Amino acid sequence: MRLILCLPVLVVVLLMVLEGPAPAQGAPAIASTFRNIPNSLKEFGNNLKDAFESIPEATQKLMTSFAEGLKNFRIPMV
């Protein structure tokens, strides 16, 4: 019974393997790629700048919440 159930799966896998690799997608024109590099670098720089500018604020929030947690921390008496 298992053989009857496995045969269709094996046939599908065999057909997929024999089909071969998918054809490559057409590459965009190299000139348009070079034209987009400055914009991509500028966007990356802006994202990096925003990320670094948010570090002090996030650190301050973390330290504040940590200090609040320490204020409320009590060692249980046994």
UniProtKB/Swiss-Prot annotation:
Organism: Acinonyx jubatus
InterPro entries membership: ApoC-I
Known function: Inhibitor of lipoprotein binding to the low density lipoprotein (LDL) receptor, LDL receptor-related protein, and very low density lipoprotein (VLDL) receptor. Associates with high density lipoproteins (HDL) and the triacylglycerol-rich lipoproteins in the plasma and makes up about 10% of the protein of the VLDL and 2% of that of HDL. Appears to interfere directly with fatty acid uptake and is also the major plasma inhibitor of cholesteryl ester transfer protein (CETP). Binds free fatty acids and reduces their intracellular esterification.
Top-rank taxon, per record: Eukaryota
Residues spanning the membrane: none
Primary localisation category: secreted
GO biological process per UniProt: lipid transport; lipoprotein metabolic process; negative regulation of cholesterol transport; negative regulation of lipid catabolic process; negative regulation of very-low-density lipoprotein particle clearance; triglyceride metabolic process; very-low-density lipoprotein particle clearance
Keyword Secreted belongs to the record: yes
One annotated GO molecular function: fatty acid binding
Subcellular location(s) per record: Secreted
Name of the molecule in the record: Apolipoprotein C-I
Signal peptide: 1-26
Keywords, in A-Z order: Lipid transport, Secreted, Signal, Transport, VLDL
Similarity comment: family membership: Belongs to the apolipoprotein C1 family.
GO cellular component: a single term: very-low-density lipoprotein particle
